[in-house]
């Protein structure tokens, strides 16, 4: 899947050339903001999230020109009452993958900031912390609605 040029996947050619080490360091630096909520990532866990992001980009065929989406997701969700130390990395991984899936399915009609804000509102609200509900019900409705409106401003509500 995906086009290749000279043995390299086309989407890989456009990834910003930040080293995984640099990206992981930026994620670990967020511990200062998340520790107050009892959430902390090790360097190995941060590297795992960098790899999840890279795999998600490849899977969806997306190209990322600016790093920082993982950090935005961490900042947005770190004070959720539904996050715990035990499932923090797994939850972040699922949110990263879901973010890329929605961006792809809506042809980028939703800005990153709006999508992250709406994911958080639904996660803490109608989904009560359920990633399955967020992915299966709410996000599918968001995708349908965003595509139907062609990207017009919208807010995710219980009746979305």
Residue ranges with predicted function:
Residues 39-44, 48-151:
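Acidic, low-complexity, intrinsically disordered interaction modules
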Residues 3, 145-160:
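Short acidic DE-rich linear segments
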Residues 1, 13, 19, 66-67, ...:
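Intrinsic structural disorder
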Residues 9, 22-24, 133, 154-159:
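Intrinsic disorder/low-complexity segments enriched in polar/small residues
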Residues 2-56:
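Short terminal alpha-helical segments
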């Amino acid at each position: 899947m995906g086009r290749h040029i000279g043995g390299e996947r086309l989407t890989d050619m456009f990834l910003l050339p930040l080293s995984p080490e640099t990206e992981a360091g930026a994620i670990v630096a967020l511990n200062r903001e998340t520790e107050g909520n009892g959430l902390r990532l090790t360097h190995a866990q941060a590297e795992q999230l960098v790899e999840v992001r890279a795999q998600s980009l490849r899977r969806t065929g997306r190209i990322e020109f600016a790093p920082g989406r993982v950090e935005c997701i961490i900042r947005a969700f770190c004070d959720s009452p539904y996050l715990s130390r035990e499932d923090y990395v797994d939850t972040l991984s699922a949110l990263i993958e879901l973010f890329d899936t929605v961006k792809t399915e809506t042809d980028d009609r939703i800005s990153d900031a709006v999508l992250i804000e709406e994911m958080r509102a639904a996660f803490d609200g109608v989904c009560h912390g359920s990633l399955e509900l967020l992915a299966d019900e709410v996000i599918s409705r968001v995708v349908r609605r965003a595509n139907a409106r062609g990207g017009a401003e919208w807010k995710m509500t219980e009746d979305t």
